[in-house]
Amino acid sequence: MKSSNLLFTTSWVILLIVSGAIVLISAGSLWRGYSGTPDGLTPEYGLSQIEEQGGALATKAFRGRRVTAATWAIGYALLAIAVTWIPYRRGERWAWWALLISLGLSQLLSLARALALATTVGLATPALLLAFVLLGLLAGVPRVFTRLNLKSEG
């Protein structure tokens, strides 16, 4: 029982850390989009080249896409924190599935760019996030899906 509690505590702590990291990284991306900090498509092709090719409107659109993506990521990470902190810590099965779908599926879709777009640039981040999400969720399986917990929900 003691090891089960430790494993479950490890589970929700990992999920909170992953969700918190998403908030912090996305906040940095949001700041980069709003502040005009040097940015670019690739290390060789930055905002100045985008402006040369497409004008000021293209640069604003590029920065706007970064801001939009960052705000969505912050929103879903804050929701993941709330789901982890309250229902998941109570051992509610739906919360486990919700976290798997929201955190896991989003990273799988991000990894799909390797096949769909034939690019591996930026794959490390979703791969690491997916690995830690799966680690956190797998550590919670014994607590969330035990017979005792299933009987109390049924």
Regions found by a protein language model. Name each.
Residues M1-G154:
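Topology signature of small-to-medium multi-pass alpha-helical membrane proteins
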